[in-house]
C-alpha cells in the first residue's frame, strides 16, 4: 500500500543545473529529478551553464534556459511517478546575487499561461533583458568602488548591508545595468533575484524577495529591516529611488510566509492540487544551513576547492572580510559567512610536495601528509615555551585577507608577542602539513570569535558542533586538527547530504512553513524530525582543554602576521 501523506518540493537553481527534490513530512527523500544545463538543454551555446564576454569580464545566463529547465525537472518527476496532487508546499534555493529583469507585460503573461505549451514558448518575451548576471561575473569594479565609498568606506557599507561591495552583488550589477542599458532599465517593471524569479514562475505573478537572500545585494539595511535609501539613490541614478523601490518590491519578514497558491498552469499541466502553497525561495548559501537543524553557534565548514564557513548566530558583528545575512527562517538570528579562494588546492600543493620528497611521486594519497601532520605538535612547538610556526599559503590570490598569491612563513613567541618572518627552523615541506591546516582553521577562528557563546559547563566560547562538508570532510586527520582549533563541545561531525544540501534545505523550509505550530521555529520542528544517524557521523573530538587555549594564543600571533603581510604588500605597491 502506498502512503498518501503530504509531500514537499525543494528546488535548487544553481549555475549548472536545476534540481527538484521531493520529501515527505518525515523528511524522507522520495524523488529527485535533475536538469543539467549543458547536457539537457537545447538552443543555447552555454558552457558550464553560462555565457561569457571575456572583454568586459561578464558572465551571465540566458533566463529562457531556466524556463526550459523547470519544465524539464517536472517532466522528470512525472516520469518517476510522482503524484503531484499530494504536494502541499514548494520552496526553492537560487544561486545568490543573480538578477532577472522583467518587462511590463510579465505579470499578464505569467497569469495567462496555456498548459498545452511550454514555459519557454510563452515567457521568453516576459523579460526586458534576456540574461541574468552570474555570481562569477567581475564586470563591476567601478560600481563596487562607488558603493564602497558611498557611505564613507567599506566598513560603513558592511555595517549597513552585511557585506562590503562585491562584483557579484546585485546592487553594483543593477547600477551597471542602469548605465549600460538605460533603455532596458527604463522598460524593466520588476527586478527579481534568482530565488524570487523561481517563486514567481510557480506563483503566476512576481514573488517578493526573501528576507535572507535580499542581504546579498548591498542594498538592504539589515539592522533597519528596510532598503537603504542612500544606496538606492546611488543605484537608481537619474531614474530615482521610488522607481527602483517599485522594481524591487516589498520584502516580507516571515521566511515561511504562504505567498499564495500554485499557478493554474502547473495544476493543469502536471496535476498539482490547486491548494498547493508557494513559499519564499531563498539563496543557495542560506538554504545550505537549512539542510540540518543548525543551532545558533554551530559551525559548518565546507572543505572544497575553496573553503566556506557558515554559522548561525544572534550576534551581528559585520566586517569587510565577512558576510552577514538575515537568517532565512528565524528572526533574531543571522547567517555569518566566510568565503576563501584557497582551500583544497593549497592543501594538495603541500601533499604533493611531501609525496614527491618521500618518493611516492604522482600519488594522490593523503597517507604521508596525514601521518606527518598528526606527528607534528600543535603550531610546530618543540617545547611548551618554544616558538610557534605559522604561515600563509596562497597558491591563488586570496580575498580573506585581500592579498596576492604567495607563501609567507613566520615564527611567533606568545610569551613576548614577538613575530619574525623567517624560514629558519622550518623543515619544508613536512612542517607545512600541519601549518597549512592550522593556517586555514586559525583564520576561521579569528574571524568567528565574538560570535560564539559558551556551550555551558564553564567552557570557553566555541561552537557546540562543527560540521564538515565537501571533499576534505572525508579526511579524519584534518577533522582532528579542525576540532582542536575551532573547538566543538559536542565534537566534529561529517555531514553527508551529497550535493543535495540546497535542495534539501529548501524542501525542509517548505515542510516547516506548512506544518509548523504557531511560533514554532524551524530548528525545533526540523530538529524533532531530522534523523541524525542518516546524515552525520562523529569523526573527531572537538574541544580539548589546554590545546584550545594554546590555539587562542596562536590566534593573536596569526592576526598580527596577517596585518604585517598586508602592510608589506601595500608598501610594495
Swiss-Prot record:
Protein family: Belongs to the FGGY kinase family.
GO cellular component: cytosol
Pfam families noted in UniProt: FGGY_C (PF02782), FGGY_N (PF00370)
Keyword Hydrolase: no
Domain of life where this protein originates: Eukaryota
Keywords: ATP-binding, Carbohydrate metabolism, Cytoplasm, Kinase, Nucleotide-binding, Transferase, Xylose metabolism
Gene Ontology biological process: D-xylose metabolic process; xylulose metabolic process
Main location: cytoplasm
EC number(s) given by UniProt: 2.7.1.17
GO terms for MF: ATP binding; D-xylulokinase activity
Gene this chain is encoded by: xkiA
Subcellular location: Cytoplasm
Binding site for substrate: 97, 168, 284-285
Record PANTHER family: SUGAR KINASE, XYLULOSE KINASE
Binding of ATP, residues: 366, 471-472, 475
Protein name as annotated: Probable D-xylulose kinase A
Described function: Highly specific D-xylulose kinase which participates in the catabolism of xylose. Xylose is a major component of hemicelluloses such as xylan. Most fungi utilize D-xylose via three enzymatic reactions, xylose reductase (XR), xylitol dehydrogenase (XDH), and xylulokinase, to form xylulose 5-phosphate, which enters pentose phosphate pathway.
Keyword set includes Lipid biosynthesis: no
Catalysed reactions listed for this entry: D-xylulose + ATP = D-xylulose 5-phosphate + ADP + H(+)
Induction behaviour: By D-xylose, L-arabinose or L-arabitol.
